[in-house]
Amino acid sequence: MRKLKFFLTLVITILIITGCASGGKDKPKKDNWNDFQTDKKIVIGFDNTFVPMGFQDKSGKNVGFDIDLANAVFEKYGIKVEWQAINWDLKETELKNGNIDLIWNGYSKTAEREAVVQFTKQYMVNEQVVVVKKSKGVKNVTDLKDKVLGAQNGSSGYDTFNEHPDVLKNIVKNNDATQYESFNEALIDLENDRIDALLIDRVYANYYLKQQNKLEYFDILNAGFDSEAFAVGARKADVTLVKKINEAFYEMYKEGEFQEISKKWFGEDVATEELKSK
């Protein structure tokens, strides 16, 4: 496994170096919209293991919410998306070197990233939520006093839970959460009343409950932590590209196409308020 990882890292490094020495090096210096229209192709970098945003299904096909959304956006402009699986740790480098044209895969907008990347409007909200059975009658997190909470081991949700104890940690039983290796394992315990609630990303909660046709049996409550929003990352020079993506977002939401894709993957509308109010 280590040899394989070393080999893959070596290959990626060679590709990056090759990209620097090829025609791709000119991309960061100009607005490339006319080229995208002429070539009728754009390359999007993504992590092909990030369920449900963008991943490979059992047949090897690229699927996911972001896959459907991006394909729909560029279909409006007659441009075909070429999906390029990348090392997520090198995403900004791949973009800078011209090996990809966009970063689009549950990509959070941060001040640090804004220094090197131009972002589209934020299109999707994500936050930590608490999943409970409807039959429990839990309406907000204060109802979880001395209740047993579950969380996925090593998740950002569990980290946030510990970093902000006043929000939830100091309320639940033993001031801690039972940890699980997978959401499915935790959901089984929740269904069988071995835990009273489950802390998880809204993205995953909506997806898994929707796929298993169990949304009607559970409530998804705001956990009380700050939310985050996803946006698309482009090169600083690609001003027109970002403008065109934003225009497509607003048009798709107005026409209901965004909501259709959202409900397909999550069972609800996950658009940001900015997108809804335009």
Residue ranges and their predicted role:
Residues 48, 125-132, 202, 210-247, ...:
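Periplasmic-binding protein-like
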Residues 90, 107-115, 160-163, 188-192, ...:
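A ligand-binding cleft/hinge motif common to bilobed small-molecule-binding domains
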